[in-house]
Amino acid sequence: MEFALGQAAARPNAPMSLAQPIGLEALPTPALVLERGAMERNMRKMADHLQRSDKGFRPHSKTHKCPTIAALQMDMGAAGVCAAKISEAAIMLAAGIPSVLITSPIATFAKARALNALLAQYPEHQLLMVIDSDQGLAALQNALDAESRLGLLV
């Protein structure tokens, strides 16, 4: 258990190989545990199907919340990833994911200012978000700097 905890603490977002099985009680949680080969085969199968159907895709990262998996999805042709919240988008951007769509609309000035800070921190990335109200639009208009670039989906 100490080995697993030490690895997780030293590199909390890095893959950790479990070459030797460990008991569930020794597994640092929360943990995403999967068989990578099976995951990659499933991802490739879906990407190939969408390509044959002439469809693009932007998977939602809320199912895995893992930048490593998001990068694999990008490598397989994803246009980017979706994130539910600004904080989740920040993790993906920090990991180098070039395009993130925030799927939960914001309606407060404070959230819009947090979004503005994220836009300033990652100007080379594409950040998109959904908007569903005049209140949300007003919050963005009042909070974003003139040089901020944000794609909106209505």
Language model regions located:
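Acidic, low-complexity proline/glycine-rich segments
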Residues: E2-P21
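N-terminal glycine-rich anion-binding loops that anchor highly charged ligand groups
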Residues: P15-A19, A38-I69, C82
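Bulky hydrophobic/aromatic packing residues
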Residues: L5, Q20-L24, H49, A79, ...
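Active-site-proximal beta-alpha core segment in soluble small-molecule metabolic enzymes
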Residues: H60-V154
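Short, surface-exposed alpha-helical recognition segments that flank or form part
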Residues: L34-G37, L128
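Generic N-terminal amphipathic, Lys/Arg-enriched alpha-helix
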Residues: P15-L34
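A short, structure-level motif marking secondary-structure boundaries and short turns
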Residues: P30-L32, S53-G56, L72-D75
